[in-house]
């Protein structure tokens, strides 16, 4: 049986990257909450 997590850099950034987050109001809300919490990295593309 194949495992559920099959790492792929392109897919990771396309789905969870900064531009994708900023493209929706809910995504911007995620960024806002993470900034407020003081997260070192806001999205997966901040490495």
UniProtKB/Swiss-Prot annotation:
Residues 31-40 have a biased composition (Basic residues). Residues 20-47 are annotated as: Disordered. It holds the Pfam family Ribosomal_L34. Belongs to the bacterial ribosomal protein bL34 family. One of its GO terms (cellular component) is ribonucleoprotein complex. It comes from the Bacteria. The gene is rpmH. One of its GO terms (biological process) is translation. GO terms for molecular function: structural constituent of ribosome. This is Large ribosomal subunit protein bL34.
